Amino acid sequence: MQVVGPISDEADDLNNTSIVLRLIYNGKSFLFTGDAEGVEEKEILAAGYDLQADVLKAGHHGSNASSTYVFLREVMPSFVVISVGAGNSYNLPGSDAMSRFRDTGATIYRTDESGSVLATVDAQGTL
């Protein structure tokens, strides 16, 4: 497991000090972005980390302020998991973010539609 963010502990919005973790297990990679938005994504990209991930936990519940095109191009996820409550008052996930996720070609799972999402990696490295 590698901590890739936050880069800076100074931000106008606490979402942009979220812990961002990259986990690699048996050849499969996962990126957990907390509530990170585009500001933090840009800092992480500038730091030069390898961000490729088979599974991306979408930043900030799929907010339009997160998961920018440039960030998603680096991550190249096969699966996107959006942790979001049904009927939330913030109208998340955002329609722009959903469009960006669809543009990656990734399979999208939403907890408001699917409930809990479980990803497993077996001994052969199959996700």
Regions found by a protein language model. Name each.
Residues E43-S116:
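Cap/insert and terminal regions of metallo-dependent hydrolase folds
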Residues M1-V55, E113-L127:
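Core dinuclear metal-dependent hydrolase active-site scaffold
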